[in-house]
Amino acid sequence: MPRWIFAFILPCLLLSLGVPTQAQAAERELVILTTFSREPLLPLVEEFSRRYQGIEVQIIHRRAQSSVQLLNKSYIQNIDLVLSSSPYLMQNLAQSGKLAALPEPMQTPEWLKPYALPMTEYVATIGYSGAGLVWNQDYLKTHQLPEPKQFSDLAKPVYFGHVTMSTPARSGTTQMMVESILAKYGWQKGWEILLRVGANLATASARSFGVSDYIANGQFAVGPTIDSYALILGRKLDYVQFVYDESFTLMPTYVAQIRQNHNDQYAKAFIEFLMSSAVQTNMEGNDFAKHSVQDQSLVNERFTRLPMGSIIRREECLNDLFDLAITKQLPQLKDTLLAVLEAKAQFARRPSVLAKIEQIERTVFTMPITEQEVDTLAIQIAPNSALSEEQQAESAMLLAEKGHEWQMRLEKQLEQANQELKILLAEEAQ
């Protein structure tokens, strides 16, 4: 293809995808890149537009990894703000020098810092969320299910086929929930809970806000979510219930300004708008549904605190491991659990046989990959702007190779457990 044709087609293609290019830049335009869905942000954008007549505000939705990739493109030069609860995204942008320093009054309040990013001079915390369980009260009554109190309850066999959740690869908030469980219970016990909950899943939601939607629609009973999605639905539907789970961490909502060659007055104005008393005092009541940084009522020391440095560093590795252990082998995991439950019921009065079945069950829900393996790989493939394209390709290859190895080990363990169960049942049938 001749270069002049490509030069014409590329901007057109980007424009059609909703991605701004330098040629689109306008003095009275504000472009916000966010990992949140568009709808809850629209009332805030509309109010800002009323205050600043003639300003065109554009919202671009991407997941955290996609946002990093987008901002690394040289032709993407007029994104002004990033709005997200992903510490990985914000830390990556700050460390790569893409963020502008903010005035001190915009920085994270002291009482929220134990749950927030350390690089607060580049990031403003405009609110925070808690997380917990959302459930459909009518569904629970119909299926005679108990009300859950915390995430670990969802590991119980009674919830088999009634649970939904998103995956950390598709949801930054789910990633924080997964890391919270590992931090609270330790690597092995935490993964046992995650694997048992995974085996109880009816489906894995492709979107974090899809969890609350599924449950509100009566498709499933219960799932983990941040409070904002559940609270919005709970205002409209009295059968949608929510409880906070202190096993999860608190999740600040961040906004940061992309460093530009020009002074972007509207980016600063939007951050000031989000920090204003008018927005902060009504933040929980609007569609954004975050707790204000002026509101400490939810905060207590029982919420799990995360070691942000290691959490951010190993995000990609942990996301891959979750998908390999749960998402990609969900049918096999569910079938294995069902077979184990049926065998336990069959031999409930045979203690010696039951003990063997329970040992097989423990194998199914043991994570064969150690935390040290994950952390070591995370260090080896850590993003670095100084790396050449060849070195970056080597890191990607290393992650793929290690992922394949982990997949083989996980599959082998599950197959071995199934085989042992079949042999045991065959022996007892004789």
Q: Predicted segments — roles?
A:
Residues 109, 129, 163-166, 193-198, 204, 273-295, ...:
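Periplasmic-binding protein-like
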Residues 79-84, 204, 221-226, 241-242:
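Paired acidic/hydrophobic, glycine-rich loop segments that form the ligand-binding mouth/hinge
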